[in-house]
Amino acid sequence: MQIFERLGSIQFDPVEPSFGRNAELVLQSRVAGYQPVLLEGLLYQERRLWDGFDKVMCIYPTQDWPNFARRRALMRVHYGGEEHRPMQLAEMVRSELQARGPLSSIDFDHDGRADWFWGETRLVRATLETLFSIGELGIHHRVNTRRIFDLSKNLLPEAVLNALDPFASDEAYQDWHVLRRIGGLGLAQVGSGEHWLGIVGTKSPQRQAALKRLTEAGLVTPVKVTEIPRQTFYARTADLVHLDEMNSCNPTEAAFLAPLDNLLWDRKLIQWIFGFDYIWEVYKPATIRQYGYYVLPVLCGERFVARFEPKFDKKSRRLTVQNWWWEADVTLDQRMQAALARALKDFGTYLNADEIALGAAIENDHSLIGVIGAAKSL
């Protein structure tokens, strides 16, 4: 739970390659010894974590549910009225859930269709998603990509469910959410971008005002980066101690990052500071991809050194380094090889892999042969 307390939330994405969804990939790179059953247990058994909207669809501590009351209220205003077609089935859905327990859209015998955000879908699915967005329903569990819904009152602790909006004003809410988001990012630039999504009622003027209040209160600290003198960044003041800790850390540790890791929420900042341009190409047609379908950035020490396309065969338990693209000017030395070998070994352990191998496209890459060999010897 400590990682959620520090980051606030991690992003959920339903795309599920053989080596795990985004949320699992975030955790495997940040939590030593992480196994997917840990997240599943915290979400759907202990209920200490909750599927809900923050930046977009995210996973966050259940205790934070009251803090998102304004988001749910906004959704109710826009989509919760009787004139909104999916709400025509709301009472039927509530009654069925009350009588039958947790259900997914395929458990309802209703043939109506509706225009929805991404195109036409079943009306009952739109109803479930609307009731979820306004807080009446929660996700009981998932079966692969299918969501099984239940009434929120059956999932949330009573004290959390009945808690009032803790913020007395828009400004108090904005201060909380901006501070939380900075903590999730680690370092934030004030300019508009996807990294500020989901903060209700907060555009550039409100965000600037919140940053000013938080700075005056000593909760955030402006940070200057020598190589980028015209930009001011912000960090949580409580996190600045980690800058000193970095001096005593091993400078050559490596990790394979999730494509939607919090660190990558602001791609512009990553380009400025690390000189690393990353675009997730999962939704691009194969013919126009520069790299691959689901490619993970490779962070080693203080720089991004490569891009990694894994493939995992669940039957044979074989992890294949399907493809690997080194960044320009990267020189593989013994320390980097050892760090990458440890990261690859840890990635295999996360997947319970029995074997690690190179894909056909790179099977003669001597630098990677050395990394694989070192990983196997650990």
Language-model region placement:
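Long, charged, low-complexity, helical-prone intrinsically disordered regions
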Residues: 1-378
